[in-house]
Amino acid sequence: MRGFIIALQFLTRLPMPAPLRTIVVDDAAFARSMRWFPAVGLVIGAAVAGAAWAGALVDHRLGALAALIVWVGVTGALHLDGLADLADASGAAHKDRERLLAVLADPHVGSFGVVAIVLQLLSKLVLLDMLVDARAFGALVLVPFAARIGPLVWTWWLMPLHQGLAARFRSAIGPIDLAGWAAALAAAAWFTPALLVTPLLVLWWGWHVRRALGGISGDGHGAGIELIETGLLLSVAITGLWIHTT
């Protein structure tokens, strides 16, 4: 339970009761908390789905907007920052890996990063509108959960790019953790079959960052979570349209 609280504090901006804010967190406990990332995804998903449902009582477009605002607010735009950093680095590197890594280390956001954030938010808004209109609130709970299985796989599979978050987490994730969350994903896919594309998206992003960067970093995790969330929203939307037309 301690690991879940640590993960919740790290991945969200949700207010915590005073006793939970005083939990002592050392490097080992912080690393072990990664096992709980998918569970935190369920909390995020529940908040997003709740906002979508409440907004949809007025109009499905308001539901989509409310869901997006809560999604960004609850996570503190943590993963959008990683997406922006990688977009800036990829855009400025011109296929030069050393320059890519140098730009990645720059904390400032450039034009490529701004464009990436805008496109990501617009994509989510459009897809959320489709899902809210279809009353797919259960899928909204599960998408953030499924996307946060990705960091466990990348941490176990890929070498850390530098001595940062990825390096801390690597020693704490093992096959048992992956098997447990894979079983949970399979159970979730029974209710939302569109989640079956999750392994493909996770493997695609891992292959991409290994080829482009040579390993995984905190920015790689954040960008991957964002892109997989959007990919899963798209999968749910397409699956819903296919079911509706057959």
From Swiss-Prot:
InterPro entries for the chain: CobS
Cofactor(s) essential for the protein: Mg(2+)
UniProt xrefs under HAMAP family: CobS
Protein name, UniProt field: Adenosylcobinamide-GDP ribazoletransferase
Signal peptide interval: none
Superkingdom: Bacteria
Residue intervals passing through the bilayer: 37-57, 64-84, 100-122, 139-159, 185-205, 223-243
Organism: Novosphingobium aromaticivorans (strain ATCC 700278 / DSM 12444 / CCUG 56034 / CIP 105152 / NBRC 16084 / F199)
EC number: 2.7.8.26
Lipid bilayer topology: Multi-pass membrane protein
